[in-house]
Structure formats: C-alpha cells, structure tokens
C-alpha cells in the first residue's frame, strides 16, 4: 500500500535512533530537524520505501542520506563495516553528482572528528562518483575496493549492471536514492532507470527506495514510479512525504508597460531592461529565467550593454554552453560574486548555487510545476520566502500568467505524464539481461512488468521485441541488422549471441539522442547554413523559412542535409524561433478556458476591476488590460471558453484562413491540426498550411477550396484520431527524424560499432531506408510502433486531443462558426505565426498594432 506519511516525529525520537557521533554532530551543526527529516528519517531507518516531495533548501538530500549514514556509522563503531557498496545515489545531472559528493564528504569528515573527540576511531566511509567522466583507472579501483556510497547517473548505472566484475559489487546495495525524480519521470531517461532498478533488485534482493522530488503531481503515481510493482500487479508499498509547501512562495505578475498593444518594440524593450535593472539593484542575487536559450543569451548581452556597471556581474547559463563555462558560472554564483544569472532551463534542477533572493521569469513558464520549481530556487533556506516575479510581454501571456500564479498560490498543480511501454528502451534492457545469463521468458517478462512504465506491457509486445532481437524479421539481415540474442520459444528461453554483443550494448546504451545540426544546401549544392534538428522536424515540402536573412523553400531531405530553393520575397510559413518554445500544459489550458468564462461574466459589472485584482492579486494595470482585451473580443466576435469553441473564417485575396480557438495547449493542438489538415487536403486535393499555438491552430487553403460550415463540423466528428494522425505523419520529416532516435535507442541503427562512430548523416540515411522497408513489410514492427507512440503520446498529446474531441461530440462544447473580415483579437497571435516572417519581435508587434487599429475602427472604439 502506498500511503501519505501522517506522523511527524519529534527531535528526541529521531535522536534516539542516531549513533552518538551522528547525534552530537547533528545537534552541533543544525540543532533541529526540518519537516522532511521529521517525517522521513525514522521511516527509512525502519526500511520503508519513501518518496519525499519538498522545495529546494529544505534538507531533503540529508533526509535521504541520514538514516543510511547512521547505519554505516553504527557498523563502523562495531567494527562490522565491510568493503562493499551499501548506498547507491542516482541523479540525472553529472554536475549534481559532484555537488553531492562534496556535500557528503564534509559531514562524514566532521562526524569522524566528533567520534574522535568522544574517544573512538571510526573507519573512513568512502564516497565515489561513477559517470562517463570517470577514468578506467578509477573504475578499476572501485572494483578492488568499492566505495560504501556510490554516486552515479541513469546511463552509467545501466552500463555498470553489465560490467562483469563491477556488477558483482552491486549485489550488496541496501539503499537506493533517486534524486530529481521530477526531471526523470516524464522522459525515457526515467524509463531507462526504472528498468535498471528492477534488474538491480533481481541481482541484490530487496533494498530501500528513496525518491526525492521538487513540486510534482500526482504524488501517488510518482511513488508507484519510484517504488515499482509486485508480481501480482499491486504497487510496492511505501510512504509519501509531502512537504512541498513547507516554504512560503510569493508570486507576482507584472506588465512592464501600461499598454501591451500600442507600445512599440523599442519602448517595450527599454521598459523591460529598466525594470530588470531596478530588480537587480534591489536584491543581492537575482536569477532570471527565459524560455529559450537564445533568449538567455540576448537578455544577458543587453543587460551588460545597457548597464556597464554589470559587465563582470552578470552571466548566462544554458545547455548549449560548454561544461567548463557552466561550472565557472555556478562557482561564481555560489561564492556570491555575481549579481545576476540568466538561464533557460539548465538551472531548474537542484545544482547547489548558493543563495538567490529573487527569481524573475520573462514570459509564461507554461506550467504551474515549472513556475514553482524555478521560483523555488529563491530563498534557498527553509525559513526564507521564495520570491518570484513573472514579467509578461503580451496580452495572452498576461491572461495565462494570471491564472498560473493563482494556481501556484492555491497549490493546483499540473499532472505529469509518464511514458508508457517505450519499446526502444526495452530492447536495450532485454539485450543487457541476455548478456547476464540465459533467461526464462516468463521470468524476464515478470521482471520487466515490475517497472512502472511497463506494468501494463502486453505479452505480445514483449515477444515482438525478443523476436526482433533474435533476428526473426526477414530482410533486415541484408540491411546489416543482425541477431543479437538466440530465442527458443518452445523451451521458453533466450540468451546472448555473438562475440560483439557486449561491445554493442556498452557503446550504444542510453536514451538521449545525438543532437544533430542539419545542413542546408541549395539544389545546386551550395551550402547555406545549419538549422536545429527540432526545426527541420517541422518542415513539409513547400514550406518557406528564413535563414541568414534570406527566404528559402524546402524541397527534400537526404540524410543529414535538406535541400532548398531560394525564394526571394516569398512569405515564410515557419518562424525560426518556433522549435524552442515550451508547450502549455493541458490542465493549465483548461483553467484558462474557465477563466475566460469568469471574465466574460464580469464584463458588465462596474466592480470587475476590483474583483479581478482581489481574487487574482494583480495590479490595476493588469486588470484593465485583461478587461479591455476581453471587451474587444466580445464586441468584435465571440469569447471562446470552456463551453464554446470558436472557429473563424477569414478570406484574403488568394487564401482562406480558418482559426480554431482550441485552447488545449500546443501538444494537443499539434495532434488535432495535423489530423484535420490531412483530412482537408485529401478532400479538397490541395496543400494545407498549418500554424499552431497553445491557444489554437489555423489552417490555410487556396481561396477557391474554402470550407463550408458543414465541412468544419464534420471534422470534429472524426472517428479515429490515432489512425488519421498516423496517416498524416506518413512521409513527414518528423517521422523520419524521430525514427532515427528510436532506431538508435532500439539498437536497429548503431551509433558506434567496432570502435567507430557512425556519422549522423549516415545514420539518418539508414533510418530512411529501414523506415520504408518496415512500413511496407512489417507494419507491426516494435520500433515502428514505438516511433508512432513517441510522437503521438510524448511529443504530441493525443490522449487529451481525443478527450477534447469527445467533449465536442457529446455537445459539452458547442461550435460557433463565424465569417470575419479580419481575425478577432484572440486570434492575433496565431495570425502572426502564419503571417509574416517574424524573425524579429518588432515585426510581430507592428502587425498586431495594425490589426488592432483596424478592428477598433470596426467596433467603433477609435476616437
């Protein structure tokens, strides 16, 4: 049974279980226990699995380690401490690992000193880190004399499990601590780790599992994820310690200008930097988060340029920077040498960065959990308040952040989504298992299903992965895909095959795809530049985009290259900054829909401003801006909300545009829009352009192919969204690129073989060839199934798109169809994505201003 911890132990009760030197050390250093420690330490001591959800700076890492360290000290005191690994600590960040080692070695040294003063000598408790940075010399030392506490990453653990000598050393593990669970649960690195833990448990017998997480929801699911399942299908028992709100959080939403529509870009930018300067001046250390890496660079650059006093005091920190640069920034921050750091996502995790007084978010963080994680970096100690300010730059952002801040204050978190049954990760582990010994098929199936991500795995899918590994799909051999295991279904057994198999496993395990820069060439082979793979995924033939200040039309792709044709003066269909944007969570999107209804009902209330200011704690500027925005929409068109879905048709000289106001987040909108565009292009026999945002999507057709209201209503009666989307994905760049990732993880295309690294271009060509072969001959091939699952469930959000469609079908949401001369105010942001190349934010604002002026004239609001 999984239950919430009810009992808060007293300091005395905890001191009672601690060894004398540990007790004295703790008393001297901290004096008293923090909430997570009061709930967790004794339970871990008793051998319970525990998940701790608490803010940064609440001592959760020590809560996890204290009981384990205490046990090691007790053993040491009795002379029973052996040379073996007792504690395994796994974290997704290599940087975090070095932090943890430092933060463990110090207390261990101090405890030995205390013991020495008390008159007895304790043996040294050794701590070691094993990651891809660890030298083979260090690794050999660990085999000969294993550390008592081993610190590692999910990737290195998977390799260690198959290291013949070292895996023997893992048999003695008693405690496993998984840190930053929130950063693992939603992706395949987490899947990878959970399978490793089940394999470890099979090797070492039962151990205590301790999960540490920042703010995350629903905790029951996350606990099942960390603890795993019993063979009868019930979750393993354990405790949830939820002290995620032990720390006070203050969140303010601010607009840097009074008028978000008419302020020109230069003034807006001036106001933003002026406000940032004020905030940095008022606080000792400020951490600024932008939503993109390029944004982080830009903000840091402008702050230094505009305010020379900050030249040495401001740095940027994001994942594109080299490791050394990042470490240097973290060190400076810890020593208090910086006034401000600008980051994209790289500082969200618990790297120890010393004390931060204020966190500023520029633009919406798109999810309540992310907002709380980022703002939780402020006030690093428990009694300090986490102060956060969100600065908004447009009206949609203002509405979204108003709801987001309200949810954060009222602890309404977004649900996380844990990938289910990723077959590519399963391939790696079944191969890893075959390297250990000969397995009974049913035993292996049972083991896999103990891991949360696979607790619903069908036997069919499991067998299809084994059959693929055993080379039972004809036609793959000549594509150089060879069998890696033998499989005897009659006997119900499988095992390793081939000398090279172990090397293949070592060289190719892991879940993070190699990031590719895609080269862009003209058809006559002239090199133009590179784009990110994420950007290339979005391209469809005929798409027009800007690179190095010129416009090009996408023609085709070969391997790692894409070919284009210069198209001077053509209007781009895809903005360059699109690939990095964070998607809005579905739960928050629904709350914004409800907020729209609430504001709609306030529009004629003379006290509207006051009501909004009180309930949502926004200032007068913000309340006025929101009400103004909604009044314009209501006058010109209809306000879509949780019961009304607005679809607008806007005709231009040559094109017909359809705006679907489906406020369900970009991931769900991507699923819907691609399926709809596919159906329309089949029916009308023409190309359909798509633009997608969190608040809806737009379809663009030639004017003579326009859709009737009936056509649009029929789209929403769509029977099978999955099947339609699958057809829509056929031949897309997205499918080709994602298939390479899945084929890498599923060892169909090896990144490294015989000590050589295969070029990404080569891999991509192989992927395209294999994809064609499999689609034609084996539509049920496990890795083909997985690439569709990954795109539809992890990249897009098909489940919530289906849910939304069902609400429309059941009539819970009514469709309102309008023909408008211009897009309504709520559609402005979509119009811009599909309108002009808004490489520059200035052009965006200019365009919105022009649209706004025309509409105000139409509803008679211009003097």
Curated annotation (Swiss-Prot):
PROSITE patterns: HELICASE_ATP_BIND_1 (PS51192), HELICASE_CTER (PS51194). The keyword Membrane does not apply. Residues 41-234 form the Helicase ATP-binding domain. SMART domains: DEXDc, HELICc. ATP binds at residues 30, 37, 60-61, 179-180, 377, 380. The record marks 512 as: Wedges between bases of the loading strand. Changing residue 512 to A: No change in unwinding or annealing activities. It comes from the Archaea. CDD domains: DEXHc_LHR-like, SF2_C_LHR. It holds the Pfam family WH_Lhr. It catalyses: ATP + H2O = ADP + phosphate + H(+). Keywords: ATP-binding, DNA damage, DNA repair, DNA-binding, Helicase, Hydrolase, Isomerase, Nucleotide-binding, RNA-binding. Belongs to the Lhr helicase family. Lhr-Core subfamily. Monomer. A DNA:RNA helicase with a significant strand annealing activity, probably involved in DNA repair and RNA transactions. In vitro has a slow helicase activity with a preference for 3'-overhang duplexes; displaces RNA from 3'-overhang DNA:RNA or RNA:RNA duplexes. 3'-tailed double-stranded (ds)DNA is not unwound. The slow helicase activity on RNA duplexes is ATP-independent. Has strand annealing properties in the absence of ATP; forms 3'-overhang DNA:RNA, 3'-overhang dsRNA and 3'-overhang dsDNA duplexes but not 5'-overhang duplexes. This is ATP-dependent helicase Lhr-Core protein 2. It comes from Thermococcus barophilus (strain DSM 11836 / MP). The lineage of its organism: Archaea, Methanobacteriati, Methanobacteriota, Thermococci, Thermococcales.
